[in-house]
Amino acid sequence: MTDIEKFHDTIAALESGKVRVAEKVDGEWKVNSWVKEVILSGFRLGKLTDMTQGQFSFFDKDTIPTRTFTAENGVRIVPGGSSVRAGAYLAPSVIMMPPAHVNIGAYVDEGTMIDSHALVGSCAQVGKHVHLSAASQLGGVLEPVGALPVIIEDNVFIGGNCGIYEGTIVKENAVIGTGVIINASTAIFDATTGEYIRANENGQIVVPSGAVVVAGSRPVSKGPGAEQGIHLYCPVIVKYRDEKTSGSITLEDMLR
């Protein structure tokens, strides 16, 4: 099999959901680095081509066009400028509000809502019944090939204008409040325990299951910043999901 044949076969397997960039094995997320390697080969093997559509001019590698869908796919893509790149999987009952973008290698499971101006970055893994609110972004992680992508587990609610980057894992049932930014260097303060959650040995921040995270700050501990009362941004876990929190999210789902 030639490199280009392997690439096209892998893209087809990604789009069908049979192959994933990352998957849960015995309760732990593992990256399939060979899939990333094949995806990256597509940029090397492809040739820049004219992909102009009507009055809109586009130019990209011919190996990585946008995906096309039919009604039989069961994916609701509302008109208005959304795009899904080749090699991305969208399960039946996924909803995309315009404009939104899902990049190569991403996996979006059933019942998930991708709201307007949202981004599902390259290789990001999104579980079932996730709500990705307007203008929120899940960062892409193609390199290094051994690094886990951003992972959002089942039943997570992500508020508007959030940014989840650098291989962050958000465990099931968590709620990320409006405007929260999380990356590998972000320490999260758990107000229920008084402890900070920092990146693990793999360089990843893991948001615990059911955590309700809001934007907050922490004081600079020393130097001129401390003298001036300067604070640094810090996400804060204010509580863990309860019936009241779940009730408000259920109402949001009903209003879709």
What label would you give each PLM region?
Residues M1-V75, Q204-I205, S209-A211, A215-R256:
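Terminal amphipathic alpha-helical/low-complexity segments used for targeting or macromolecular assembly
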